Amino acid sequence: MINSNKEICLSVPAEPDFVMSLRLFVSGLGTVAGFDVDELEAMKLVISEMLVMSVKDEQKTVDFNFVLKDGELTLRANVTFDDRDDLSLKIMEALSDELTTDDVETVVKFVKEA
């Protein structure tokens, strides 16, 4: 388990071929941070939605910033959502502990259950 702040930056081509690799990466981070299987599945679904939205919006790359600290995983990505992405946002809100989005990025926070 990670006890101090760790930051990981990852730039991924916004292509469907990279969804599986990204899901595996976030699952590994969550495992190291001590999240359980259900929380890992939620993380993988959220990260998939983010990459799918970037593909749909024809972004070239998606820049992810992961911060692990004290039972939390915070994910920032240069992915934005509009009205047509309402279902994706609802899914992400239901699966995460905290979600904010603006014109520049989306921030998702997961907090490990005690």
Outline where the language-model segments fall.
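Conserved beta-strand-loop-beta-strand hairpin that lines the nucleotide-binding pocket
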Residues: M1-E7, V52-A114
